[in-house]
Amino acid sequence: EYGATAAMFFIDDNTLDYLRLTGREDTQVALVETYAKAAGLWADALASAEYVRTLHFDLSSVVRNMAGPSNPHRRVATADLAANGIAGPWAMPDAGTMPDGAVVIAAITSCTNTSNPRNVIAAGLLARNARRRGLTRKPWVKSSLAPGSKAVQLYLEESGLLPDLEQLGFGIVAFACTTCNGMSGALDPAIQQEIIDRDLYATAVLSGNRNFDGRIHPYAKQAFLASPPLVIAYAIAGTVRFDIEKDVLGIDHDGNAVTLKDLWPSDEEIDAVVKASVKPEQFRAVYGPMFKLHVDTGERVAPLYAWREMSTYIRRPPYWEGALAGARTLTGMRPLAVLGDNITTDHLSPSNAIMADSAAGEYLAKMGVPEEDFNSYATHRGDHLTAQRATFANPKLVNEMAIVDGTVRQGSLARIEPDGRVVRMWEAIETYMERRQPLIIVAGADYGQGSSRDWAAKGVRLAGVEAIVAEGFERIHRTNLIGMGVLPLEFQPGVTRLT
């Protein structure tokens, strides 16, 4: 998540305890210890290691944090939400309406966060405490729990915390990638319409890894990353304008005000439940069958895939045909987009829900796909005709060429040249494809950060982009561009798109 190829951590007794907890055999744990000590990876052996740079970090300074909006590295302590302009005074809405900053999606999700039993148990204990005090989530919050492992369900059942989570709306919906990859599913139509009618600042709070604009849901204007227990707290609060450390979450059965500190479990409580409820046999029951070999002697299949020409999920890609297989001219290129800093792969090829009025939605409708089966861009990436229409389809895109009435307009827009017309991005791409016009993209720093999404490179190549000039590229995306035959070029130091 921070751009490194690998991170090395020393091995100690805590590592071995985790291996035992997650069902590893004693012989394997002993082998890890023996190897680590022999290879110089054991904690004691690294005490005298010399490093190019040493950072000193005071663990006692760690407080509750969130990340957002818009970037995973935009950390903010929950105690500083008001100072950062996120939390603040907000008018109580009329009965039946949502407040400013409404949390419309609250999701405990992502294989990263749910692989830590302490995080999940902490969420369950907070849910239990909230339930006992008579608190529940706000009615406009779509909530879910999507663990990365089936072992999570087993230890939540063992601890008796699953019913408490379910009561607050955090029942298990899948063991899969869901909200964190833009696949939360549809909002309640009435809630979605209210967001549109009131131009409401609606948000998502999730325990995922990335929160780039437009990634989580088209109608969640921004998203915040939080720990699983904080996700539940925000589902109860119902808005990010809420000062989660100070404001009153609700009134209990006895008329007492309830704040976050009244619900937050202590480390001792969490450790006790983990010790009693998280067991090695749960992990063995889930993962053991994966390693039992089974030879399938059933029906033989052809060695080559039988392509279905009309499929909207997977069809034969054209990367080795026609213009895509020809030599690049690198001459006479017109700019498809001029972009700023921090363009993510979610800007380049979003993975979230396909809206009916999008280019991909209109294409799927023409192919006879009902709107309820549009699903997400991620599920249709095997069909290049759908995925092409996802290129730069993020509604939060800011193409500096898309100037309307003297100002740059946000959206999936481009300006066709030499016509000077500002149109939807796909219309511009389609026009340039018909003209066989080679294209170039100009951008700022950190181009291509975020998920290592190959379609972020495939899409621009299919659009006819031959080169991208930027102040800097994310390493994996740069490699993907080269693999697709798109030339990544960097400005000389001190030179930008604006100089």
Go through each PLM region and give its residues.
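Self-splicing inteins and homing endonuclease
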Residues: 51, 55-61, 204, 208-211
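Core nucleic-acid recognition elements
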Residues: 13-14, 28-55, 63, 91-104
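Extended C-terminal subregions enriched in glycine
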Residues: 140-185, 387, 457, 470-489, ...
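Non-catalytic terminal/interface segments that mediate subunit docking, oligomerization
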Residues: 54-160, 164, 296-467
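Mobile "lid/hinge" segments at catalytic clefts and subdomain interfaces of large enzymes
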Residues: 1-43, 121, 127-142, 171-290, ...
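Hydrophobic alpha-helical bundle architecture
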Residues: 164, 171, 187-197, 206-207, ...
